[in-house]
Regions:
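Hydrophobic/aromatic-rich core segments of domains that either
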Residues: 81, 85, 104-157
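Acidic, low-complexity glycine/serine/threonine-rich segments
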Residues: 98-102
Length: 157
């Protein structure tokens, strides 16, 4: 029996404090809020396919501007701060932020700071579940660190 067959159980994705130990840096909250609202508007008005293509295009255009080495302390600080900022501002908006909006917004915010994330959507068969998350350097940001082993990725940007 593989680890993926164990799955992640009855998963209710929320902003668990255990995954957001870092306080957001000053100034990042407003950018996080703008990014979250823009992502929600794009998904609501243009749909999933357009939002995914938009993220692909943004990542392709920003690939040349990635400048922080993944092992630097500044890189790690920005990653943790961005994940915490999106989680915090998600509590301010008048709608429930799901994993898709959170992960797309986090990916966009990281790209704007010169960090290249990997956006993933994965599934498990039983109980059927799909979930979106973000990784940087093989580490899950703002979510269960065991997701890559417990879910089968079907989309990666």
């Amino acid at each position: 029996m593989s680890v993926r067959e164990h799955g992640i159980g009855d998963y209710e994705w929320r902003f668990a404090r255990q995954f957001h130990q870092t306080a957001p840096a000053r100034g990042i909250r407003l950018r996080a809020l703008q990014t979250l609202l823009w992502t929600k508007a794009l998904l609501s008005t243009r749909g999933f396919h357009t939002a995914m293509n938009s993220l692909r295009a943004l990542k392709a255009t920003r690939a040349d501007s990635i400048h922080l080495p993944p092992e630097s302390s500044e890189h790690k600080r920005i990653c943790a701060s961005a994940a915490a900022a999106i989680a915090e501002v998600a509590l301010w908006v008048p709608y429930r932020v799901e994993c898709l909006e959170y992960s797309m917004s986090l990916s966009r915010l990281l790209l704007s700071h010169g960090i290249c994330p990997t956006f993933r959507i994965g599934v498990q068969r039983y109980d059927f579940l799909s979930h979106a998350w973000v990784e940087v350097g093989g580490q899950v940001l703002g979510d269960d660190p065991n997701l890559p082993e417990r879910m089968c990725p079907i989309v990666e940007i």
